[in-house]
Amino acid sequence: MKVKSFAKIDLGYSVYKKQKNFTKHDFESIFILVENIYDDIEITKIEKNIDDVHYYNETNEIYVYSRLVHKTLEWIRHTYHIKNHYRINIKKRIPIGAGLGGGSSNAAAIMKYILEFEGIKEINYKDVVNKLGADIPFFLSGYKTAYISDYGSVLEDLTGQFKLNYEVYLMNVNVNTKIVFEKFDDNSWHVIKNNFKTIIKNLKENIVVNIHNDLQEYCFELYPNIKYKYNELLSDGFYTILSGAGSSFIRIKLKNKEDLIINEN
């Protein structure tokens, strides 16, 4: 079976300091599905006692360090008492380390297909967040736009509630998300700048203003080339902001315009 695994952008990103005895950061954001950037995934049940996962680009097999797909398959078997193993072939088009949620999208697409195939409808988002990742519930939800809170486990559907004309600028930089968060954690002083209730109200009125990404300055410190490109991209009529921990940018223009992907070679 073949399925598509879509990217997403994070419009605004408020990150909270870790609470005592917590290993994850709470956060707030607006996630938007990007349906013209996607990976193709082929899923086949196999008669083996081990999963067989491979990644490809347009021409060759590639090595991907993340074991999130393996962890997801193990979580499915443990949680739902499914014994099957699978061959997973993933053709990557979503850039790795781009702040577009590619790994989480892959995990969610595979989980969604297997659970539907097995007739399972119940998914505990909090368990998914705790065991696998904060972005996965959004990709499972079927929402095209959502306000995300409570470590990624609570989603408010915003699909169709505002029209946003934007460009996604893809840089050829693989950002290490873990290091960006470590840089964020090193700073003991942090002020939350986003008011998402106000942001959502403004977006419904076609107003894009005062939207911030708390990780942006830390990404720029670690990757000066990304900051340099950000300064280049700032221009009249566009609101430019980093997606996630980077390296992609969202450029928002309020005039009617089809979504556009700009690639940096």
Curated annotation (Swiss-Prot):
One of its GO terms (biological process) is terpenoid biosynthetic process. Pfam families: GHMP_kinases_N (PF00288). ATP binds at P95, I96, G97, A98, G99, L100, G101, G102, G103, S104, S105. The keyword Transferase applies. Its EC number is 2.7.1.148. GO terms for molecular function: 4-(cytidine 5'-diphospho)-2-C-methyl-D-erythritol kinase activity; ATP binding. It catalyses: 4-CDP-2-C-methyl-D-erythritol + ATP = 4-CDP-2-C-methyl-D-erythritol 2-phosphate + ADP + H(+). Pathway: Isoprenoid biosynthesis; isopentenyl diphosphate biosynthesis via DXP pathway; isopentenyl diphosphate from 1-deoxy-D-xylulose 5-phosphate: step 3/6. Belongs to the GHMP kinase family. IspE subfamily. This is 4-diphosphocytidyl-2-C-methyl-D-erythritol kinase. It comes from Ureaplasma parvum serovar 3 (strain ATCC 700970). The gene is ispE.
